[in-house]
Amino acid sequence: MTTIVGVRAREVLDSRGFPTVEAEVELEGGARGRAMVPSGASTGTHEALELRDGGKRYLGKGVRRAVENVNERIAPELVGMDALDQEGVDRAMLELDGTPNKANLGANAVLAVSLAVARAAAEALGLPLYRYLGGVQGVTLPVPLMNVINGGKHADNRVDFQEFMLVPAGAGSFAEALRIGAEVFHTLKAVLKEKGYSTNVGDEGGFAPDLRSNEEAVELLLLAIERAGYTPGQEVSLALDPATSELYRDGKYHLEGEGKVLSSEEMVAFWEAWVEKYPIRSIEDGLAEDDWEGWRLLTERLGGKVQLVGDDLFVTNPERLRAGIERGVANAILVKVNQIGTLSETLEAIRLAQRSGYRAVISHRSGETEDSFIADLAVAVNAGQIKTGSLSRSDRLAKYNQLLRIEEELGRAARFLGYAAF
């Protein structure tokens, strides 16, 4: 009943209007699974390869080659395999690809099929996806890290840092956290309008006003939290993703919006000052992906005070994470399924992080779809935290709404850790 009898893919569009891969898997008993893959704007150099067509069509962003790889190369390999053997299915695709970064088939082709297989298996067993992936122990609803002010590569403004996030960890449930976040988001819109700033939104649904500095973004968030009736650092704290790999050139950090060029040690001192001044709970990619010595210093100075998340640093890769653990850098990993390219490898990275005392933060990408797989994944692995954008754009809300459904379905079994998740 769970034997794979059909695998096919098609080209669909993501939230930025560029093509991505959607795969469908059909099982012998009639169950079907479908999955779409996201795409990042600021990508780590160590990520698995997203296969694009090049040429004029879709400005070079087409994915016909990846779709063809699913239909003509992956499908014949997987037909006849058991969808319940996720590791076996993923291993077969990895062997077929034969490269360390999935450059042959494309991580977008491999991942779409990998996720669709899991969905089909869950459907065949009559289980919700989070229960299939996590068993009876997957009951933790994540604290949302809501990207409400966008800068860097996610927006056209003078803000160097990419994401300024609300963390409504003082809530008692996911539903309450979502409500608090929404109230602050709408209050922030009113504050921006009052100050004459644009309320246009960036890729992830956050506002992208042309602010004068990175610090102004933080001050506006604190004002919005207070205006909404909450206390910064209590009901709502802050998280940052400065995406500093995008600012790192010739061994220095170039904060062009502020006219500063900082060394690694100066960048660490910068973060120390901000953590002292503001209610910051988490800093993601506070230093560049290959600045290992800088990361060691950052972890030494701030690792006991705030969550230090490696995104470009680890790229959801168990080998990169192992190296980081051995060197004692960061204390959390950002998990993006398309950075590594299969569900099995993603779960391996999460398990390694959790065994090693590192937090795992499940994350979307800036180019998203209506697929809500990561919402179920966050609950399944008891991640405790999720990054899936702001309180606008339906591609972001799809994940939040799925989490609301899961919390309702779990009922009294649902757990929400709040600040204990950090």
Swiss-Prot record:
Q: Which UniProt keywords apply?
A: Cytoplasm, Glycolysis, Lyase, Magnesium, Metal-binding, Secreted
The record's EC number reads 4.2.1.11
What are the protein's GO molecular function terms? magnesium ion binding; phosphopyruvate hydratase activity
| Stated family | Belongs to the enolase family.
Protein name as it appears in the record: Enolase
Tell me the pathway: Carbohydrate degradation; glycolysis; pyruvate from D-glyceraldehyde 3-phosphate: step 4/5
Q: Where in the cell is it found?
A: Cytoplasm; Secreted; Cell surface
Residue positions annotated to bind (2R)-2-phosphoglycerate are 162, 336, 365-366, 387
> What does the record note about the cofactor?
Binds a second Mg(2+) ion via substrate during catalysis.
Which cofactors is this protein said to need? Mg(2+)
**Where do the TM regions start and end?**
none
| One Gene Ontology cellular component | phosphopyruvate hydratase complex
Biological role: Catalyzes the reversible conversion of 2-phosphoglycerate (2-PG) into phosphoenolpyruvate (PEP). It is essential for the degradation of carbohydrates via glycolysis.
Superkingdom in the source lineage: Bacteria
Q: Which residues bind Mg(2+)?
A: 241, 284, 311
Q: Which reaction does it catalyse?
A: (2R)-2-phosphoglycerate = phosphoenolpyruvate + H2O
Q: What is the lineage of its organism?
A: Bacteria, Thermotogati, Deinococcota, Deinococci, Thermales
GO process terms (BP): glycolytic process
